[in-house]
Amino acid sequence: PSGYAVREAGPPAYYRPNSDNRRQGGRERLASTSDKGSMAVESAKETRYCAVCNDYASGYHYGVWSCEGCKAFFKRSIQGHNDYMCPATNQCTIDKNRRKSCQACRLRKCY
């Protein structure tokens, strides 16, 4: 690409509420567990995932939720004007464990 595109701000591409699927305000909520009646603290933080590799997102960078690794990769890619070539079929799987295996496909997922 000749430049870079910034995605429109809006609902996050990869938003997943915490595991119990209940939105909680900015506070922790106490809930009793059904077994033994003990109290447990549920986290109020909503988990967001990187739109590129699906790792945990560190923040909203360049218009999408992304991890620190993909944020830095995208920044280096647009500043260095790199021309990456996919050694396979331009359809490599980019996830947390394989995000470093193909820079061309990783950059393509950034756009």
Swiss-Prot record:
Gene3D superfamilies: Erythroid Transcription Factor GATA-1, subunit A
Keyword Signal: no
Stretches with biased composition (Basic and acidic residues): 19-30
Chain positions covered by the region annotation Disordered: 1-42
GO CC, alphabetical: Golgi apparatus; nucleus; plasma membrane
Pfam family, one: zf-C4
Keyword tags: Activator, Cell membrane, Cytoplasm, DNA-binding, Golgi apparatus, Lipid-binding, Lipoprotein, Membrane, Metal-binding, Nucleus, Palmitate, Phosphoprotein, Receptor, Steroid-binding, Transcription, Transcription regulation, Ubl conjugation, Zinc, Zinc-finger
Region feature (Modulating): 1-49
Localization annotation: Nucleus; Cytoplasm; Golgi apparatus; Cell membrane
Keyword field contains Oxidoreductase: no
Entry superkingdom: Eukaryota
Modified residue annotations for Phosphoserine: 32
DNA-binding region as annotated in the record: 50-111
Function: Nuclear hormone receptor. The steroid hormones and their receptors are involved in the regulation of eukaryotic gene expression and affect cellular proliferation and differentiation in target tissues. Ligand-dependent nuclear transactivation involves either direct homodimer binding to a palindromic estrogen response element (ERE) sequence or association with other DNA-binding transcription factors, such as AP-1/c-Jun, c-Fos, ATF-2, Sp1 and Sp3, to mediate ERE-independent signaling.
Domain statement: Composed of three domains: a modulating N-terminal domain, a DNA-binding domain and a C-terminal ligand-binding domain. The modulating domain, also known as A/B or AF-1 domain has a ligand-independent transactivation function. The C-terminus contains a ligand-dependent transactivation domain, also known as E/F or AF-2 domain which overlaps with the ligand binding domain. AF-1 and AF-2 activate transcription independently and synergistically and act in a promoter- and cell-specific manner.
Name used for this protein in its record: Estrogen receptor
